Amino acid sequence: MESHSDVLIVGAGPGGLACAMLLAKAGVSVTILEKSDGVGGRTRVFEKDGYKYDNGPTFFHYPEIAEEIFAAIGKDAHEDLGLIPLDPNYRLVFGAGGSLNATTDLEDMVSQISDLCGEENANGFRRYIEDNRTKMELSKRCLNTPWRGPLDLVSRRALRVAKVLRPWRSVASDLARMFPDERMQLAMSFQTKYLGMSPFHAPSLFTILAYLEYEHGVFH
């Protein structure tokens, strides 16, 4: 195959498509190669016998990244992708009794948690949200700043981030300090399964996974 494009991208998954969109907006000629018969990669949808199936994820998490990419090319991610916010995000039904409707209405979450397992856990949820807002903000600054060498790993910036990320703790041990009730620990930790990890082994950084759902919502 002969191509006269300035850039050749292999794979029409989310990363390849995002690169192509940004490059094309900048005036670069781009060609994308894809082995499948459609775009999307792991997020592709395919049809069989009149039904549509998700090739991978069944919902959309943390829209801010897509919003930034689409805004950079003068588009609206929610409009062009047809994102549908879910409310509630999902319902959790506990084997030990009780349920929660996970929602971005944080005060409603506090009220539900208080009814389910008391004020101590409700206050723990407030602390969890504030803690992870800080964790997310410092993580973003850290990831958006160049790391030029080994000395950066022991810089004031790195130590400040490490203090908040607490890499010496697991997700499970971090949550146990905020939620005495095991149902709440489960509600805020099962998201590590998205990454194929156990909350007992996943670094505490990944407490942000549930936080992103409560702060930014879940979309279909």
Regions found by a protein language model. Name each.
Residues A77-H78, P146-G149, I208-Y211:
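Short, intrinsically disordered/low-complexity patches at protein termini
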Residues S3-E137:
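N-terminal glycine-rich phosphate/pyrophosphate-binding loop and immediately adjacent elements
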Residues A71, S189, T207-A210:
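Generic alpha-helical structural context detector
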Residues I69, A202-L205:
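A short mid-domain helix/strand-loop element embedded in enzyme catalytic domains
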Residues G95-P203:
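Rossmann-like flavin
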Residues K35-S36, S204-T207:
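Active-site-adjacent bridging/hinge elements
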Residues K48-K52, L195-G196, G217-H220:
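A short glycine/serine-rich beta->alpha loop
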Residues I208-H220:
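Helical element adjacent to the flavin cofactor pocket in flavoenzyme catalytic cores
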